[in-house]
Amino acid sequence: MLHNPAGAASVLILGDSLSAAYGMQESKGWVQLLRDEMPSVEIINGSVSGETTAGGLRRLPSLLDSATPDVLVIELGGNDGLRGFSPKQLKSNLTKMIELGQSNGATVLLTEIMVPPNYGPRYSQMFNQVFHDLADDYDVALIPFFMTVIAPQADLMQRDGIHPNEAAQPKITQWMKPWISEAVTNAD
């Protein structure tokens, strides 16, 4: 965790392996690269590899209590999708996380998540629609899924074909930074 002077804006990133620097040193992950680019902002990485929305929801209250972030970035849902969890349960968990963040005074950003096409068009569409519906219902910014530009480039992916590699991290940082910067500016 990075500590900044009192009064500095703070951002909590609640994510899964895509934000937890899976398969590399944490210092090489996009969240640390973002810290390096935004030194006046306290960026707390509450991401855990393998995390589902249910796990994130369980951990969020204590993270909000200890961090009191100005901005909450929710990058969860991928593991729910890969496990074929119900879009209804996904929506319920994400709804509660958004409401928790907002009731604690945080500006919430929701990262869109998509599942691979082999899960079938109906499930894929229902799953993805959850993110769009929640962004509309709760008036939160929906950050387009960064993996749509990373995953098609084999040289940016780890051998498992699921996780972005170290070379992808600066690209993810540049994808996420404008959204987070704007939210921090508007939270002041």
Model feature map: region roles:
Residues 2-52, 59-68:
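Serine-esterase "nucleophile elbow" of acetyl-processing enzymes
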Residues 33-38, 57-188:
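Alpha-helical cap/lid subdomain in secreted, periplasmic
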